[in-house]
Amino acid sequence: MCVSQDQLPQQLRYELKTAGIPLEAVSLYAVNLEKNQLLLDVNSKEPRNPASVMKLVTTLSALEILGPNFHWKTEISYRGQLKESTLFGDLIVKGFGDPSLTLEQFWILLNKIRSRGIQKIKGNVIIDRSFFDIPYHNPSEFDGKPFRPYNLGPDAFLVNFNSIKVTIVPDKKNKNIKIYSMPTFKNIKIKNKLKWSMRSCWSWPDTPKLVKENVVFEGLYSSKCGVKQRYYSMLSPDLYTAEIFKKIWKQLGGSIEGQILNGIKNSSDSFLLDHRSFPLTHILRTLNKHSNNVTARHIFLTLAYEQNNGKSVSTEKARAKISTWLKSIGLSPSEIIVENGSGLSRISRISAYQIGMILQRAWDSPLMPEFISSLPIIATDGTMRMRMRNTDLKGMGHMKTGYLKGTRTIAGFLKNKKKETLLVVCFINHPKAKNSWPIHKKLLTWLYERT
């Protein structure tokens, strides 16, 4: 039997009242997929901000449009003459939006170039980022936190998510705080003004400030917080790429006499090699397990790749492609707003019912295993790793979460006590939404135990 608004379980009503969230701000939709039985339907057709649950739309559209074995490429060419181990001219690197070009993969790419016999580059290294035809992205615009990687914009030649790993270590012997970063850059000076504290670790100063040319960490850091690691995007993509390129190229025994510059690959340039990314299915795990926004943006833009025959893609072209896809699966594009594919948006809108239809299509698809395996497992990994760890629900579901100011969402698949698979969606849009995890927890528990 479907539970309507008037029949909502008392436990859920209690959690809503405790959180100060009216039922009008909540959308619920749940289906027993094996019995084809509607379990919950409350405000399910109300368009709401889905936050990162929008990544489910990006995920399924990518699997169906690009295919599970889609690979991004990075193309290496040169202009001038290659004699013995010396390139008398420019090395050209054209990016096509590979979102998996980590430090390790970038090292492999540069090592491939070295293995083709190039050691000395007498000209410049030209980086062609033109495949993404997008305007300048301001990383401060969304919430004023430009160093946080979730605010990073797409880049057709993105290296290592443009990130620096910062490790904060309390030194109990000397009662001070140490900071380490990797990789290191001469252009970035991290200034440590953190002070030792013995207070409870309910929060820690994880948002540095830019003071002149220094990135400053300041405030009280509790020794009870232990070692903390966080990633930051502190350099422009152009500068980050240039510094990493020079550092690794030198480690490989190479040299560059010119500069590392942005430019355009010419049709007359001589092809050297292609570097292929991990397959889409591998990258989707990074996207959903860790809710990686820039990966979502890259996948979203790449949806327009095939229809443009390898020409540059844009946000407008990607939106047109996803609108066509939504229409093809029976959803109305006019009722859904997909701004950038990541869910990091104030204007994105979709209903719980429509997300339910996306999940239903994924469940019915031959690509169902690839889709579901990309989602975080309850109390096991990704954004669900710390959720419901000491409950019977551990490992019993794959759930995508969403988090923005005024928004908390969750959607995915849950096994109930009878080992039947349930489709679950819960959207909460309200100023007090930050208090809503107990609501999600109670919903999942009730569905697990009572349905």
Task: Set out the residue ranges of the language-model regions.
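Short active-site loop at a secondary-structure junction
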Residues: 41-61, 65
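A generic structural motif
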Residues: 46, 97-99, 428-432
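A short glycine/serine-rich beta->alpha loop
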Residues: 42-48, 231-232, 342-345
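Short beta-strand scaffold segments in enzyme catalytic cores
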Residues: 28-30, 74-76, 411
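Beta-lactamase-like hydrolase cores
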Residues: 2-47, 111-116
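Residue-level preference for non-acidic, small/hydrophobic
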Residues: 36, 55-62, 125, 157, ...
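Conserved serine DD-peptidase/penicillin-binding transpeptidase domain
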Residues: 13-16, 65-333, 449-450
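Small-residue-rich helix-loop
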Residues: 38-41, 290, 300-451
